[in-house]
Amino acid sequence: MLEVAILSGTVYGTAEEVARHAEQRLRDAGLEARHLPRIEFEALLALDPQALLVVTATTGAGETPDALQDLLDEIVANQPDWRGRPLAVIGLGDTAYGEDFCAAALQAHMRLLALGMRDLLSQLQLDASETVTPEEDAEPWLARLAERLLAAR
């Protein structure tokens, strides 16, 4: 069974709520999905997930929340052999911040693609100016993600 690791970076908890919702939706679809909100690099490496879903908010001036930033830095520094593994990213932001909108998700996406991971689906960007139910807004995208992950097994 394809194992999907769900990593999240949050400031106020919304990204973790979306990540937990994604975990349940992917499990409902028949995938082995695990939300790992504060996993250390070595533990993630030992888990050896076949796919990654990153769910992150953007904080400050386009920054990634600290815990996820530290993990991404370690992943990039150690360059695990994840070439060809499926990657998907959900960004949470607010268009009121202009060009910093979903900047953390864009940075995470680019850094993981540079390791050779395979983009499975266009990044989902959820705008806090337009929604108060990001979990519900993610539903159609999560359904497409589940279909593509099941096909990738």
Predicted regions and their residues:
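A domain-level signal for caspase-like cysteine endopeptidase catalytic cores
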Residues: 7-11
